[in-house]
């Protein structure tokens, strides 16, 4: 604030008045309409009214409300008395702003504009929140994928992985993260990560039986556009809206080295391949027909590839591989047998082991399901012994009175039955060691570790309603085929036609279907307590 003494030496004039006599002034800021009315004379008798309620200006018997705010730059006002003297008028420390009064139409317009601005602001806020949520979901999905592939996310701190809290060098986020999948669309399955293309997976599916486009899309997890572009090249659509493999494409089918195939699947593929080559009128010495006769060589090679060290043998959880077409099958029986020979564990037979003892034994004996959900390992003797009552063991959609007994074919096939399948765990269960043979200590560290591993796998295993409905549909479609095979085999024995060359093939297929349907039934039964099918 400027005082008298501050400018007495700067001005060549005499100053009149003192600080005590000069009143406090108030600066009034008037709107343009009010000022024009005052200058034109339409507004007269202007006075200022100050009260406890507030400050207002009276003009022509009308009151105008004002807002009092402190002056941002307080100053003094002087009046020139004559050419040689100035008189202090007062000090300005407050400013009055006259409120502008609007009519009802203008007020409504301003109100609507304010509401629109608020609405636009809220919409922008919602869009921003949604975008942030999408980026968070994408980040979480990438971290989950890296964790699944055994990689640690780049932004993981040292304290979260059990290290010291010292500062660590974090790689730059701009560096590209290598993806393990060689496929253009990473579906998360192991065959896709190994680089098996979509064409091969579609061919392997259609080689078993014609399938619909929706089924292929569900199994391969491929986009609809890629699937629609590929199908006309390898298949044709029949009158049932199903895609059927073209005859020339059967030469690209991998019959014996395709791990997800079961025994029934391979038999079906071989039959369809033979018919396709016959329709193409290929000569008997054609190179394509060599794919049908190299069975023993490829099976031996496949078993050698599946053999794993005994210390790596782990119990496998009951995974429905009918959702994943190309999931690798269980280790072969030879690996478990080698473990038996090394550790002198007695073999299990049909007399001391049965898959019907407990639900846990079902889960232990069941391996990864193949394309139709069947076990890719050999069928156990316990499965074949239950063939005399297949209709009661498996839920039947129709009557079972026409089905005869298979006890006599089972007795004749006992000498050439397939090798026994053991539970996937290398230790025999308590139910299998009933005759006082070797049994591991229940409190041993290895057994506790095995039990903890199995419990963890069971907690991690979850089934969706869509997957279980697909399996139930497959069960209903496959059961009539099993029933017809059962009747055919029974008719051979009823007619004493056991020397028929087709009998062995039909019996192998019947045993495979029996094990396959039983595995499906156990899967559906386990999931029925969690899902409403």
UniProtKB/Swiss-Prot annotation:
MF GO annotations: transcription elongation factor activity
InterPro entries: E3_ELL-like, WH_DNA-bd_sf
GO BP terms, alphabetized: transcription elongation by RNA polymerase II
Composition bias type Polar residues, residue spans: 128-138, 313-326, 339-408, 435-445
GO cellular component: cytosol; nucleus; super elongation complex
Major localization listed first in the record, in broad terms: nucleus
Bias (Low complexity) ranges: 163-176, 327-338, 417-434
The protein's role, per its UniProt record: Activates transcription elongation by RNA polymerase II and pyrophosphorolysis as a complex with eaf1. Elongation factor that can increase the catalytic rate of RNA polymerase II transcription by suppressing transient pausing by the polymerase at multiple sites along the DNA.
Assembly notes: Forms a stable heterodimer with eaf1. Ell1-eaf1 complex interacts with RNA polymerase II.
Further details from the record: Deletion of ell1 renders cells sensitive to the drug 6-azauracil.
Protein name as annotated: RNA polymerase II elongation factor ell1
Gene: ell1
């Amino acid at each position: 604030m400027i005082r008298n003494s501050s400018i007495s030496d700067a001005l060549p004039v005499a100053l009149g008045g003192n600080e005590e006599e000069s009143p406090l002034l108030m600066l009034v800021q008037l709107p343009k309409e009010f000022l024009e009315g005052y200058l034109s004379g339409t507004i007269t008798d202007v006075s200022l009214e100050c009260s406890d309620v507030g400050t207002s200006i009276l003009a022509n018997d009308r009151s105008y409300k004002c807002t009092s705010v402190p002056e941002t730059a307080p100053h003094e006002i002087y009046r020139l008395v004559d050419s040689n003297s100035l008189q202090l008028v007062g000090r300005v420390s407050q400013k009055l702003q006259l409120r502008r009064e609007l009519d009802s139409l203008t007020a409504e317009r301003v109100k609507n504009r304010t509401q629109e601005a608020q609405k636009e602001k809220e919409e922008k806020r919602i869009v921003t929140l949604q975008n942030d949520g999408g980026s968070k979901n994408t980040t979480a999905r990438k971290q989950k994928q890296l964790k699944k592939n055994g990689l640690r996310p780049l932004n993981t701190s040292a304290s979260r992985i059990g290290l010291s809290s010292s500062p660590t060098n974090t790689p730059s986020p701009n560096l590209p993260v290598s993806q393990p999948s060689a496929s253009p669309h990473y579906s998360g399955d192991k065959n896709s990560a190994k680089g098996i293309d979509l064409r091969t997976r579609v061919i392997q599916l259609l080689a078993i039986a014609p399938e619909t486009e929706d089924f292929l899309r569900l199994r391969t997890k491929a986009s609809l556009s890629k699937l629609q572009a590929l199908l006309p090249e390898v298949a044709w659509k029949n009158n049932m809206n199903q895609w059927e493999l073209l005859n020339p494409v059967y030469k690209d089918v991998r019959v014996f080295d395709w791990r997800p195939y079961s025994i029934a699947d391979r038999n079906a593929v071989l039959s369809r391949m033979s018919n396709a080559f016959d329709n193409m009128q290929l000569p008997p010495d054609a190179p394509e027909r060599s794919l049908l006769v190299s069975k023993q060589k490829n099976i031996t090679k496949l078993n050698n590839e599946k053999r794993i060290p005994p210390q790596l043998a782990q119990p496998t959880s009951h995974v429905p591989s009918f959702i994943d077409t190309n999931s690798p099958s269980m280790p072969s029986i030879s690996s478990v047998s080698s473990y038996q020979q090394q550790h002198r564990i007695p073999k299990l037979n049909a007399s001391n082991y049965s898959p019907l003892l407990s639900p846990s034994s079902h889960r232990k004996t069941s391996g990864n399901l193949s394309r139709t959900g069947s076990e890719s390992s050999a069928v156990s003797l316990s499965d074949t012994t239950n063939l005399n009552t297949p209709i009661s063991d498996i839920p039947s959609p129709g009557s079972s009175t026409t089905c005869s007994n298979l006890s006599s074919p089972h007795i004749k096939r006992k000498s050439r039955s397939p090798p026994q399948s053991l539970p996937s765990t290398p230790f025999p269960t308590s139910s299998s060691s009933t005759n006082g043979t070797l049994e591991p200590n229940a409190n041993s560290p290895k057994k506790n570790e095995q039990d903890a591993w199995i419990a963890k796998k069971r907690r991690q295993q979850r089934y969706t309603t869509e997957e279980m409905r697909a399996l139930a549909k497959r069960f209903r479609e496959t059961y009539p085929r099993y029933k017809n095979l059962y009747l055919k085999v029974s008719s051979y024995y009823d007619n004493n036609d056991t020397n028929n060359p087709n009998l062995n093939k039909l019996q192998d297929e019947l045993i495979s279907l029996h094990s396959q349907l039983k595995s499906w039934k156990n899967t559906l039964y386990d999931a029925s307590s969690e899902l409403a099918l």
